[in-house]
Amino acid sequence: MPFVPVETPKCPACGKSVYAAEERVAGGYKFHKTCFKCSMCNKALDSTNCTEHEKELFCKNCHGRKYGPKGYGFGGGAGCLSTDTGAHLNRE
């Protein structure tokens, strides 16, 4: 029986093999510890501040800036808050 090497997952950031001792997982992809950083600001990430979009890693702030809602009325602060009490949901 011929020797068949085990396939190791490739890091989406650098394309090299990722071994179990150095892997970080986000969005179902395995990254190297050194590649596990925001693709916009290069901030080191962990499981609490990491977001993945199409194999790219982002911190939550940069992800919101790049893919969040844009235009007039978004990010307006406390003036945009609603005082809806949900009365329309209590139909009896």
From Swiss-Prot:
PANTHER family according to UniProt: MUSCLE LIM PROTEIN MLP84B, RHO-GTPASE-ACTIVATING PROTEIN LRG1
Residue intervals of the LIM zinc-binding domain: 11-62
Keyword Transcription found: no
SMART domains hit by this protein: LIM
SUPFAM superfamilies: Glucocorticoid receptor-like (DNA-binding domain)
Segments carrying motif Nuclear localization signal: 65-70
Tissue: In the embryo, expression is restricted to the somatic, visceral, and pharyngeal muscles. Within the somatic musculature, MLP60 is distributed throughout the muscle fibers. There is no expression in cardiac mesoderm or in fat body.
GO MF annotations in UniProt: metal ion binding
Function: Positive regulator of myogenesis.
CDD domains: LIM1_MLP84B_like
Gene Ontology, cellular component aspect: nucleus; Z disc
Protein name: Muscle LIM protein 1
GO biological process, one term: muscle organ development
Principal localisation: cytoplasm
Localization per Swiss-Prot or TrEMBL: Cytoplasm; Nucleus
Pfam families with a match to the protein in the record: LIM
Organism the protein comes from: Drosophila melanogaster
Keywords: Cytoplasm, Developmental protein, Differentiation, LIM domain, Metal-binding, Myogenesis, Nucleus, Repeat, Zinc
